[in-house]
Amino acid sequence: MNSLKFLDFCAGIGGGRIGLENLGMKCLGFSEIDKDAEITYGEFFGYDEVNYGDLMQIEPEDLPDFDFMVGGFPCQTFSIIGNRCGLDDDERGQIIYGLVRILKAKDVKYFILENVKGLIHHDKGNTLKVVLKLLDDAGYRVYYEVLNSLDFGVPQMRERIYFVGVKKELVDDSFRYEFPKKYSGKSESLEECLIECDRTLIFDESLPAYQTFYKYLDNKYNNGKHNIDELLSHEYRVLDTRQSDLRIYHNKTPTLRRGRHGILYVREGQFRKLSGYEALLLQKFPKRYADKVRGKISNSKLLQQAGNAMTSSVIEEIAKSFMKAIGEKK
């Protein structure tokens, strides 16, 4: 796979890129319009990387030739937590058309695309059918599956739908592909990810928000179910302070999402707020990358960006198994 070249579309902060680079593929550039994400991407990979900008404005002839497309196309119009708009909603829902336009114009051999699980059932499954038909009409054999990052080396519950495709002329009619079920590399435990030492992230009674949390435990949804001492009695217990109820997790975290706040965990008898650095580790960003942005990018921005990112180990494992099935050798 060392000879394969790829472009990183709707790149975010490069989770997909890391997954492919772990297999020896070479990145020729990326496409991202969020300026804050672009800064973090630059800290990770260098500011000399070529950003081709707005996917919908790219002229294919301005792109280099490449073999592999990776992209996490925007999920807002499909997400089960969004407003359930669809492909006809706005430009966010049109991004798939921009990706297909480039796939066809550049005659790209392979792709991996990611979206939220909610895409499957949106509009009673019609949105999924449209996406699959677009890719099929573009000349690809397409496979899709919902995978959970929890099975791929990180202690985070994160279900996403993944699409993989190969040009039809590169495989015969007997070709079949089955998605991997688990990660073949080193898995990280919760304790290995929740390692932040910054004391400003301790959540205790000295903070005004702590009193809000105390009242939250007594609201109509949580009243009588939990108390502070009991919650603090389990190391690395994770608390998700949703509006309706308190959800508790052991040995794993809930899905990181853009705009999600209120994830706490217990360590050494104290509540701590999840940090952006820790969120990167929960997305399988290597520490050497997370260290590059420590103290440079604000905690709130890193939390948002990690929540938007692709889990690098999932992309790595899919690409490895897909290329093995096709016959490419690393």
Description of each model-found segment:
Residues Y52-G53, K117, Y140-D151:
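Conserved S-adenosyl-L-methionine
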Residues N2-D107, K117-H121, N126-K129, K133-D136:
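Core alpha/beta nucleotide-donor-binding catalytic domains of modification enzymes
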Residues P64, P155-R160:
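A short, glycine/Asx- and small/polar-enriched loop/turn
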Residues N115-H121, S149, Q305:
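Short glycine-centered, acidic/aromatic-flanked micro-motifs in structured strand/loop junctions
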Residues T127-N148, V166-K168:
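Charged, glycine-enriched surface loops/patches
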Residues K109-L113:
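Conserved beta-strand signature within the Rossmann-like core of class I S-adenosyl-L-methionine
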Residues M1-C27, L134-A138, R160-K330:
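S-adenosyl-L-methionine-dependent DNA methyltransferase catalytic core
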Residues F152-P155, R247:
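A short beta-turn/loop motif at secondary-structure boundaries
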